[in-house]
Amino acid sequence: MPISEVYNMDCVGYMKTLPDNFFDLAIADPPYRDSKDNAPQKEMRTNGDIHRFGDKPENVFFDELKRVSKNQIIWGANNFGIPFKGFIAWDKMVRGSDRYSQVEIASISDSLGTVSRYVQVSCAGKNKIHPTQKPVALYNWILDTYGDKIKTVFDPMMGSQSSRIAAYNRGYDYYGCELDGEYFDKGNERFNRECHGVIKRADGTVVEQMCLFDGL
C-alpha cells in the first residue's frame, strides 16, 4: 500500500522542513490572482456556493517547489512568467462555453523533456468540491505519461485531492498540503470514498480514519 500523507497547513512552511530533491515529482495548481491588484478576484461556483481564488503565490513558493522536487508540472505557468520549453495542453472539452478557458496550460520541467503534449479529458461533473477541480483521469494520464521517472508525488495545493486519488490508484507515494480547512475536509471525504491514507494536522498529530473495506 503506498504512502498517502496530507497536511492541513501552509505548503511553503511544510516545504521548508524538507531536504533538497525530497520528491520525484511536484504537481502544482496555484491560484493566479493577486489581491494587491486593483482588479477583483475571480469568483466561481461549486454546487451553488460562491468561492474566491486565493492569492497568487510569492516567488518563495516556486523556489521551494523546485528545491524539494526533482521534476515539476505547474498548471497555469503562463500566468506566472515562468520560462518553460515543454508543456501540457489540456483540452477540457467544453465546446461553446465562454465562461472558462477551454484549454489550460501546464509547464513541465526540462528534466521531464521538452516535448509538448496535448490531452483531451472532459472536466464535466456535477459534484465538484473545489472551484479549480481537475479530473482524476487527467492526473492518471500525467502519472502514466511521466511515471517512469517517479516514485513520490507532491501536490502543494491539492484542493479536491484528485492528484492524491490518482497517485494512490497508480501505487505512488503521495504527500500533499491544503491550507483551507473546508477544502481539506471535503477532499479527505472524497479520497476516503475510494482509498485509505494518513491525515495529519499542522502539529503532526494523526487523524484516525476508517478504511472503507473494514468489516467487509
Language-model segments: residues:
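Class I S-adenosyl-L-methionine-dependent methyltransferase catalytic core
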Residues: 1-154, 160-216
